[in-house]
Curated annotation (Swiss-Prot):
The gene is menD. This is 2-succinyl-5-enolpyruvyl-6-hydroxy-3-cyclohexene-1-carboxylate synthase. Pfam families: TPP_enzyme_C (PF02775), TPP_enzyme_M_2 (PF16582), TPP_enzyme_N (PF02776). It comes from the Bacteria. It comes from Salmonella gallinarum (strain 287/91 / NCTC 13346). Keywords: Magnesium, Manganese, Menaquinone biosynthesis, Metal-binding, Thiamine pyrophosphate, Transferase. Its EC number is 2.2.1.9. Binds 1 thiamine pyrophosphate per subunit. GO terms for molecular function: 2-succinyl-5-enolpyruvyl-6-hydroxy-3-cyclohexene-1-carboxylic-acid synthase activity; magnesium ion binding; manganese ion binding; thiamine pyrophosphate binding. It catalyses: isochorismate + 2-oxoglutarate + H(+) = 5-enolpyruvoyl-6-hydroxy-2-succinyl-cyclohex-3-ene-1-carboxylate + CO2.
Amino acid sequence: MSVSAFNRRWAAVILEALTRHGVRHVCIAPGSRSTPLTLAAAENPAFIHHTHFDERGLGHLALGLAKVSQQPVAVIVTSGTAVANLYSALIEAGLTGEKLILLTADRPPELIDCGANQAIRQAGMFASHPSQTLSLPRPTQDIPARWLVSTIDNALAMLHAGALHINCPFAEPLYGDMNDTGLVWQQRLGDWWQDEKPWLREARRLESDKQRDWFFWRQKRGVVVAGRMSAEEGKKVAQWAQTLGWPLIGDVLSQTGQPLPCADLWLGNAKAVTELQQAQIVVQLGSSLTGKRLLQWQATCEPEEYWVIDNIEGRLDPAHHRGRRLVAKIADWLELHPAEKRKPWCVEIPRLAELAWQRVVAQRDTFGEAQLAHRIRDYLPEQGQLFVGNSLVVRLIDALSQLPAGYPVYSNRGASGIDGLLSTAAGVQRASAKSTLAIVGDLSALYDLNALALLRQVSAPFVLIVVNNNGGQIFSLLPTPQSKRERFYLMPQNVHFDHAAAMFNLRYHRPENWEELESALAGAWRTPATTVIELVVNDTDGAQTLQQLLAQVSHL
């Protein structure tokens, strides 16, 4: 019997089973113990293959692919710390709902806890963060193939959102020519190999329940809060709220067009908060809210009912309001709960939103970080997409810009870490094949610098704007101790990114004014390649401008 040949047949069943559940993208890191899985994926024509030498970046690449494709994405890594490097992407997927299938190769049980090389306790290492876990046995013909395929099918059928971790131990030898070992074992699956359906088909009901008292609540004074959702859902939510006459507070990721722009500015005005206190119901569609003032208002508002609608299960209201948690796709829920045409009940908030917008526009000519956030809608590629980093940049765009309704916006706002942002953006571009604008800070770019290797392979123009404010300037917005701020919070690195771009043979520009930036962008959008644009800005201007605008708008 050939161990290596049967390992490959076992792995081939696993990978083929994944194709029956919509898996098309497979992300592969180099490794020896994962050879059976890698070869099975490489030989399966149903897959699009992606490779990367860094498992942490690989996991985030898969995350980006899943965000756009809305299908599960498989990741293959070898044993040991390679597995641990998937942790941050797995956590993010658990919070934002993308489906990742983590296929982690492992040593067989007899090599665990005995000093064997590259052998760690992988089973259960991700604790409660995966949505599903599956620890497979060592490949053996004593276990029928139908058990293996039905086990994979069951795990995937139960995966509603987040990650499925499948730990796959393989004994040596891992290499060798294929022979007839295990062929009969494999053939017992019959015509399943030619079919396109799962071996085990499990129906899942995910239908929205209609709230029978909706006709009553839609006649009340309501507020709509729009969090993360798809571009199509964003347009529908905006129209729904407009018909109801309810004010819509749209997050940067809502894609609603933010009809009341600069919400994180005007929510700092007491007149706005007073008017919102008249709301009898708040309907929040989507989660992962960004704005600090929005979160503060959400935490203190006390409507009669607070509804949260999202297709991700679990509690999504950190303020723990009395109300309803409804698990449903946003578009489906809107269809079941039509709006009734009513006059807008808010008067003060539209006025404040307009005045806040005017204050922001008045500062747009200065070359700086806050002004870039405001201008970002002018730089979006036509029929393209935007990827927004974390920390200060996403807050500035949320507070100071007004993105077009229905324009695709992506980000990692689940755990909101700065790890893997460039890798995620690379996955977003690969899955969509669209022109992409990504914007991150300098520390975020440094944190995922080797992901520039992934950006050498793009199918449409990709522009990475690195806002270099020399450190983590978001801490300038927080009451960090002044004497300790620079060394222990901001951590300025005093670096530029021209050499990094050159290392990976990427185009590079460092504009010093708006005209130079617009010229660099015009050239970049004509070229199906990656262009790194570094904006070197004054360290504290972005945070200070936001604070100044907050003070101005609060006194309107």
